Amino acid sequence: MKFGTLKTMVMAAGIAAASATTAMAEWEPNGPIKLMIAFDAGGGVDTSARLLAEELTARHGWEVIPENVAGRGGATMAAALKDEPADGQSIGLTAMDSLAYGVLATQNPGFGADDFTYLSTITGTQAALIAKSDRGWNNLGDVIAAAQAGETITAGAMSAKLADALYLIGEANGIELTTVMVQGGKGGLNGVVADDLDIAWAAGPQTNGVLAGDLVNLVSAIGRPLNASPDAPLLSDYGVEFVFGTMFGVIGPADMDPEAREAIQNAIAEIVNDPESQLSNYITKAFGGPEAITGADFDAFMQAANNEAALLLEAAQ
């Protein structure tokens, strides 16, 4: 069975967003807009949020104040945002997996997917399994062959979802990978570079190393070719029919004022889709490039993500 709905949603909605008009609604905030950031200061998501805040202020005169509310893979921010007023003056940037797989995999996280208004995505990850080039592995098939020959393969994963992915790779190919949990995408990257790990998941920080020839993207986990390694195989080539990348997006509390929702989501999409914007240039270099999915398309994307998360959890039992 193919689980291609999620990646199809991303592509179709991205095309629609790129061709949509960006007329702003007549809404204006009554004070500062708090932009809650689900991750620590200094990382890629934090940088993206701060660039977005700067450009919203510059283009629309809104005072947008970034605030880091990190912890529990995005759950701390989500729990806090849920109880904010739905007037458009409290929004948050997070990884959408935290509101799909994260909700289903965690017992009573303090919120559910329907506790939020989905405004706009900004970009997606370039999730892949990586290895050092000097290992001599060109793709995941080479790693599988090494494991089948008796080699112990240590594999870094920065989330329970990606640990599930390693389990499914092993199950589909008759091998057992030794999973090591790491802190963030750079944890896996650093482990591979230091020879502490044989392979690891990375979601974008590996790109410079791949382009320099020091690292190899062994397999794409996003259901389509990687920007830096368009010839890398897909997980489906090895019997795993799930997508393991994530999108980063801006959300608000449930039942947001309709005029506020329209104005904010359109303003974000305009910045994301503008090739001259600092945000667009940054996410092109650091992530998968601009992907603005808004409104009803974003709602449908999240429904598909939740459906796929349920199937993944069932498959990984």
What residues fall within each predicted segment?
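Surface-exposed aromatic
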Residues: Y282-F301
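Sec/Tat signal peptide C-region and signal peptidase I cleavage site
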Residues: S19-A25
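Bacterial N-terminal signal peptides that target proteins for export
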Residues: M1-V10
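Short coil/turn segments
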Residues: D40-G42, M96-D97, A127, K132-W137, ...
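Hinge/capping helix and adjacent helix->loop/strand transition within the periplasmic-binding protein
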Residues: W27-I33, A80-Q89, V103-G187, L235, ...
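N-terminal (or domain-start) structured segment
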Residues: A25-D115, E151, K161-L162, A172-W201, ...
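Bacterial N-terminal signal peptides
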Residues: M9-S19
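C-terminal lobe and pocket-closing loops
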Residues: G124, Q206-N281, A300-N307, L312
